[in-house]
Amino acid sequence: MTTLSLCNPAPYERAMALEGVQLLEHLRTPALTVSNGQVSFANAAAKALLGAHIAGQDVRIAIRDPDAVAVIMSDTGGTANVSGLSVGGSEWEIDVFVLGNDERLISLYDLSVQVSVARAHADFVANASHELRTPLAAVFGYVETLLDTRAGGDEATREKFLKTIRHEAQRMQALVEDLMSLSRIEAIKHEVPSDTVDMVVVARETAGEFRDGTEIRVEANCDSAEISGDRGQLAQVLRNLMDNGRKYGKAGGPVTVTLEATATGWLLVAVRDEGPGIAPEHLPRLTERFYRADTSRSRAAGGTGLGLSIVKHIVERHRGRFDIASRPGKGTTASMMLPLRKN
């Protein structure tokens, strides 16, 4: 039995740290120890990341990053970021704790999720800025022309410019409203809504909002279809999907909304148009923020590039599934599966 003297804390701390290393075997976090520049221990997670035969390797071969190795071999330890340890270019943080003169305890933390979130945030800000800057530049250009007395121009030209300014201002307003809507939805995405909502009623009321001559049909295999949900958000989903069918489908319609209650406790809601359809390579990305299959057509139709992203977030908040099916020349069907309310 080993006796530790608490009058000399260094050996005690070292022994406790070494004993703790054995507990790391069952952790999901990759961890290893280095003695005299060689890997002396690696838990299962570290072996899965760096290789099954990592024990006994020179740390310079195991880690393959000069900056990280320098931290590992330093007298003070510390942290270093490393990429390329795993397939797919994941980013890792190496945390080095000095156990003794020649021994180190190393923990590795996957930063991929943090990096991905940061990159998505940066992309989102850049895209939002671009989408706002484009109409804003047009507004400034036309306003400056109108204010320039030397430019002249008759009343018809002035009216044309003012209509363009109004159109671009409406584009910015729509974008800001969608950005705020998306922000509100994400803020409460973990709150499961519990109000009783009849989707048949909501579908018929929403279809009645469109008065531009587009034929919107609502067909249901039941008189009512109640789910637990947020009525306003569900109406927003249907409004967005119907509006897409109206804008990108065949001129004048029809846009067909079907509601089918299944025996397995789900409600299938599908919105189908008879437009030109969408190429298959675009389908997986349609719910990404600001992604457009046809940029010029979308902007001409007044789209913000956020509508389907909003739809996806709302459906997921309601514990449902959202899907888009389309073929060029065969129209597009956007569908969602929502759990029916249990009585």
Predicted features and spans:
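Short helix-loop "hinge" at the ATP-lid/N-box region of the Bergerat-fold HATPase_c
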Residues: 245-246
